[in-house]
């Protein structure tokens, strides 16, 4: 379908009908197949939240470029962006950080709290998956573990190896704090 759309005037991509455009398609024989099975893009919303409208726009652009896999990075040390109903603190606590790293030395932040309400409900996640599927795009939602879990550990410190205290990271890089694989509560958390 995208190859056919590309043969039509650019107005095919507009949201409103265009009446002053000639919708003519040249006679053609199309032999079009992807070279690679996996043609994807990655979007990191754990560190910077975009919201539903932008994610759908991203998927629209992916469709135009015949990409078929959306790798959606939803959790990391800097923020938790997906609702898990059994663990509400993941979003009420884990989505919030006290600032964002803005300098190359990684030790200074802008001091501006970030993340209030910046997460997706399960219904919104389903909506994005359905929207993507209608465009022939598979969604790979990423939840990092056992590392890159400071947002989760801030919400549930008992899941860590040290018990904390933890805070949602305002830096970039790799934290030493991870989920404790030897902790039975951690295993229950992962199963849920």
Model-derived regions, located:
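Feature activates predominantly on carbohydrate-active enzymes
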Residues: 1-177, 181-192
């Amino acid at each position: 379908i995208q190859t056919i759309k590309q043969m039509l005037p650019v107005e095919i991509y507009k949201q409103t009908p265009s009446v002053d455009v000639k919708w003519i398609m040249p006679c053609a024989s199309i032999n079009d197949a992807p070279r690679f099975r996996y043609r994807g893009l990655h979007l990191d919303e754990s560190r910077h939240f975009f919201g539903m409208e932008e994610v759908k726009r991203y998927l629209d652009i992916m469709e135009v470029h015949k990409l078929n896999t959306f790798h959606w990075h939803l959790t990391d040390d800097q923020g938790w962006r997906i609702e898990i109903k059994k663990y509400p603190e993941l979003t009420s606590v884990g989505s919030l950080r006290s600032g964002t790293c803005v300098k190359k030395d990684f030790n200074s932040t802008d001091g501006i709290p970030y993340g209030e309400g910046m997460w997706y409900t399960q219904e919104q996640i389903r909506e994005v998956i359905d929207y993507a599927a209608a465009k022939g795009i598979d969604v790979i939602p990423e939840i990092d573990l056992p590392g890159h879990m400071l947002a989760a550990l801030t919400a549930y410190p008992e899941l860590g190896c040290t018990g904390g205290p933890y805070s949602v990271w305002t830096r970039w890089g790799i934290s030493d704090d991870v989920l404790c694989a030897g902790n039975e509560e951690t295993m229950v958390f992962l199963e849920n």
